[in-house]
UniProtKB/Swiss-Prot annotation:
SUPFAM superfamilies: Translational machinery components. GO terms for molecular function: 5S rRNA binding; structural constituent of ribosome. HAMAP family: Ribosomal_uL18_A. Keywords: Ribonucleoprotein, Ribosomal protein, RNA-binding, rRNA-binding. It comes from Picrophilus torridus (strain ATCC 700027 / DSM 9790 / JCM 10055 / NBRC 100828 / KAW 2/3). GO terms for cellular component: cytosolic large ribosomal subunit. Disulfide bonds: none annotated. Part of the 50S ribosomal subunit. Contacts the 5S and 23S rRNAs. Belongs to the universal ribosomal protein uL18 family. This is Large ribosomal subunit protein uL18. The keyword Membrane does not apply.
Amino acid sequence: MKTPPVLKRRREGVTDYRKRYRLVISRETRAVIRQTRKGLIIQLVDYVPEGDHVLVTVTNKTLKKALNIDGNNIQMYYLAGYMAAKKGISLGISGAVVDTGRAIFRKGGRIAAAIKGLIDGGLEINADEDIFPDESRLNGEHLKQRLDINEIKSKIGE
């Protein structure tokens, strides 16, 4: 018997098909969080057999155009998650499961901040409170150029 071929996306380390299968069979909207070299991408995605259907996309460029803020830190990930949740709720999405892909998830890190933003924005996501960054880090007390999170959240909510 011949060994089955290894799929290209698995060989390149892009897709974990076991994890993707478990997420897809849940039949819930996925909150896809991806880190790039210079920014982030947060998408709310539904599975259809022909291919995934992207409902909402928020990137660091979206935040820069809409709110004139820039960066690649915990505050930006939190605000991007918050904005994605608000856009998703306006489309009738109430909850999601988190899809971090092959990214290494760290307690209190940027991905955790994005999940916190999704939850604070109103999406129902099953996550433990221990993984989120402290409020002081979300408010940017560790940064030289911090953002006023509450002011920006009120702009997003409008």
